[in-house]
């Protein structure tokens, strides 16, 4: 067996790494029971090593792994040429979430002890990974209701046929048909229940447009990098800066990233036991809520704020206001009590209002000034006038953040975000072709993502070790 692979083969290193970790939690279920026939319980180190090694090969199918164990040298060496069936492999992968999370954190601890990670500075990014959803499984309320009714009819018919069977006839085929019918009904019922929940959360005008996949109810229709749309999950990845190791990974059904930053930071801290000092993310995470929450944690957020010009462009177009008269073109005067428009007219502070938890000062021009102005149509737009402009009253945390993002050294630091934060996506989706989950459901998708993260970290560690010169 030793001649199957070289001494520096990745399978050997993965076996050694898994041997350094406490995997007892994986084997908690392997207990003998009096009066019951024993079944083989494969060692956790073996199954963990097989899955990590397989993901580094870009193989995510339990059936494919079971076939490859007959000829792939690394898998043959790990299993000592023993055959492990696909059901055992598949059940192990998704059946030990808590143990897997503990193992992931243990390995990060070993990397920290080796001095190859910088847990003070984190980088965060998200990517969409397609779900295991059938092409024709995306249905609305009426179709799913019909599927449930039809499923119940089929089961009643099969039960009646089973009751009428003569004694001595082989009923295995009929039993399999009944089992398949019940599973189909359960999927339709789960999808219908999910759809009703989503309808309750949607705006009344959008409820009739809600759709759910019958084969993958948790998945959501999300925009893909190529501009298309597909039923997917949103994978949130947190990476440390020094060696690009993943320190946290999570899977959500939210198409928008804005609310995922703080849960990701908390997960990374739980995995490492170290409170980060800085987090770098793209502008999709730059919200006032995230600025305030990171400030409360003494966590420095580096994420480019969308300028007033970019935020207001759509609003100006909808309201018939020329870009030259957008709110950002009005200049403050007298300590923020007045604004001056591009045409030289004064706007006076008239009130303070709150939108989505943010205080805004409202400035308004004199009606006579707007009525006499030759730029009235371009400035006042569809509203007609007098012109009003709102300005956010920024909190101390927001002011500090905006000032920070103007510093040259911070801008230079942000330029490194892409090559670090997006590298795990390139490894998983580009190199290893992991562009679709191989398991169903949000929980199991999260478990598979953690296996991918573990395999990625191990592959990074193998790369780092290979670059270390061997002492003579």
Model-derived segments and spans:
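A short secondary-structure junction motif
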Residues: 21-25, 72, 76, 431
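Basic, short loop/linker segments at the boundary and entry of helix-turn-helix/winged-helix-like folds
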Residues: 5-52, 57, 393, 397
């Amino acid at each position: 067996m030793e001649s199957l692979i070289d001494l520096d083969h990745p399978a050997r290193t993965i076996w050694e790494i898994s041997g350094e970790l406490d995997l007892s939690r994986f084997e908690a279920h392997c207990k003998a029971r009096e009066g019951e026939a024993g079944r083989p319980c494969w060692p956790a180190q073996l199954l963990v090593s097989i899955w990590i090694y397989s993901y580094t090969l870009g193989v995510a199918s339990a059936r494919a792994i079971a076939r490859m164990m007959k000829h792939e040298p690394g898998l043959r060496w790990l299993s000592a040429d023993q055959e492990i069936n696909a059901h055992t492999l598949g059940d192990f992968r998704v059946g030990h979430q808590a143990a897997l999370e503990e193992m992931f954190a243990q390995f990060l601890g070993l990397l920290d002890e080796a001095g190859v990670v910088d847990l003070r500075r984190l980088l965060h990014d998200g990517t969409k990974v397609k779900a295991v959803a059938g092409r024709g499984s995306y249905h609305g309320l009426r179709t799913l209701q019909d599927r449930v009714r039809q499923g119940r009819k089929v089961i009643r018919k099969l039960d009646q046929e089973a009751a009428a069977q003569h004694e001595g006839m082989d009923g295995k085929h009929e039993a399999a048909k009944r089992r398949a019918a019940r599973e189909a009904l359960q999927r339709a019922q789960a999808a219908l229940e999910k759809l009703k929940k989503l309808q309750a959360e949607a705006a009344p005008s959008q409820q009739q447009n809600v759709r759910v996949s019958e084969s993958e109810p948790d998945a959501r229709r999300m925009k893909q990098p190529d501009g298309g749309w597909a039923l997917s999950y949103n994978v949130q990845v947190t990476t440390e800066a020094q060696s690009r190791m993943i320190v946290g990974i999570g899977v959500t059904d939210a198409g928008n990233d804005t609310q995922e930053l703080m849960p990701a930071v908390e997960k990374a801290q739980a995995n490492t036991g170290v409170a980060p000092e800085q987090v770098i993310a793209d502008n999709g995470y730059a919200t006032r809520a995230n600025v305030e929450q990171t400030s409360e944690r003494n966590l420095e957020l580096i994420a480019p704020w969308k300028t007033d010009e970019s935020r207001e462009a759509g609003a100006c177009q909808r309201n018939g206001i020329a870009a030259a008269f957008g709110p950002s073109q009005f200049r403050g005067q007298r300590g923020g009590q007045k604004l001056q428009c591009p045409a030289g007219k004064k706007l006076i502070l008239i009130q303070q209002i709150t939108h989505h938890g943010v205080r805004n000062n409202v400035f308004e021009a004199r009606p006579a000034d707007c009525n006499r102005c030759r730029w009235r149509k371009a400035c006042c737009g569809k509203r007609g006038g007098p012109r009003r402009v709102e300005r956010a009253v920024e909190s101390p945390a927001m002011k500090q953040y905006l000032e920070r993002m103007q510093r040259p050294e911070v801008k230079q630091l942000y330029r490194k975000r892409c090559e670090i934060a997006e590298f795990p996506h390139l490894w998983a989706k580009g190199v290893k072709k992991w562009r679709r989950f191989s398991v169903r459901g949000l929980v199991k998708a999260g478990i598979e993502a953690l296996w991918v993260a573990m395999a990625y970290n191990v592959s990074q560690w193998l790369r780092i070790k290979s670059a270390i010169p061997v002492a003579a």
